[in-house]
Design a protein with these regions (language model features):
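Bacterial N-terminal signal peptides that target proteins for export
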Residues: 1-7
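Beta-solenoid repeat scaffold
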Residues: 288-296, 303-322
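Acidic Gly/Asp/Thr-rich repetitive segments characteristic of extracellular carbohydrate-active
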Residues: 265-296, 302
Length: 322
């Protein structure tokens, strides 16, 4: 069984490499803040931006080039020259996913913009300059902060000693600027705040912690002291939110729908999947209770033998282009 699985994976990887050379891919450029950005994998870091997890939802005809960066607003992204770098790379038919707001609301002069004026102006610039290069802009508003204040508390904090039952918005008018500019300029808009608000509310106060960086002390090398972070997503949260984005894209940007793929688990050495090894995915699949499980193995070197109980699964071992 071990040998058969390994040979199947190797054969599919070789076939997929041949197929990938035959067609120029579409690129999705991503610009935004830490909730979208790629994260370091050092010391077992489990934080992920939703953009980091997006490649596992597309065929190899789509390349995700994530330029989102921690701590950036629409203003600082422009002033640091990051937008110029992205703009120079856009070709006709590419996409630019734009999500700012978390840091635009901060008071620091190098970050702050105003909804209805400077924030909207920066979004318009991204749209106009993307279109001038033949690209397709898509606007998003910010993902929700997991903010459950105790009853009667109006001050927004990073965390509370005791949480209340109602999820309360923290972004205000910064959520409306992308919607407004999208309507004004006929740009696809994804209300990612509503999607994530509904997700967190539906999961409830305690279960929704599983999406975010709630880390017990002593569990991970990258954060031995532990942390409570209601803004940033973990591996599970990043995958779930990326899935919500893909669902919305199929309606708002139907041209991308034919490139969408869905698997129960994704294995990826670059951190864009649920697991780093095939064996971890197989173990999760065997214990998951489903008879048919699909596993995507993204490109990388997997020097491992894969073992699984006979007849436990009907299907495993899809490659990145299979």
């Amino acid at each position: 069984m071990k040998l058969k699985v390994l040979l199947a994976l190797c054969a599919l990887l070789l076939l997929s490499a041949f197929i990938a050379e035959r067609k120029e891919p579409i690129t999705i450029f991503m610009i935004g803040d830490s909730t979208m950005a790629n994260k370091s994998l050092k010391n077992g870091n489990i934080e992920r931006g939703w953009g980091q997890m997006l490649p596992g939802y597309f065929t190899e005809e789509v390349v995700v080039d994530n330029h989102a960066m921690n701590g950036r607003s629409s203003l600082s992204f422009i002033n640091e020259g990051r937008w110029d770098v992205v703009l120079s790379k856009i070709h006709k038919g590419d996409y630019v996913f734009i999500q700012f707001g978390h840091n635009d609301e901060k008071p620091r002069a190098t970050l702050h913009t105003e909804p209805g004026s400077t924030f909207d102006d920066n979004l318009r610039r991204f749209v106009n300059e993307t279109r001038a290069k033949g690209g397709n802009p898509v606007l998003f508003n910010s993902i929700v902060r997991r903010n459950f204040p105790p009853k009667g508390v109006t001050e927004i904090k990073g965390s509370y000693e005791k949480e209340g039952p109602v999820l309360v918005d923290t972004h205000g008018e910064y959520l409306e600027s992308p919607r407004r500019v999208a309507g004004e300029m006929n740009v696809p808009f994804i209300d990612l705040n509503k999607l994530t608000h509904d997700l967190v509310t539906g999961m409830g106060v305690e279960n929704s912690r599983k999406l975010f960086m709630w880390i017990p002390a002593g569990q991970y090398e990258f954060c031995p002291e532990g942390k409570i972070d209601n803004t940033h997503l973990n591996i599970y949260g990043g995958r779930i939110v990326a899935g919500l984005v893909v669902d919305a894209l199929m309606e708002e940007v139907p041209a991308l729908a034919k490139y969408v793929r869905r698997y129960d688990y994704v294995v990826a050495k670059d951190g864009s999947g649920d697991f780093f090894t095939v064996q971890e995915a197989v173990n999760a699949a065997v214990g998951g209770g489903k008879k048919t499980i699909s596993i995507l193995v993204r490109p990388g070197v997997y020097e491992e033998y894969v073992s699984m109980p006979e007849s436990s699964l009907d299907r495993i071992g899809e490659t990145d282009r299979g």
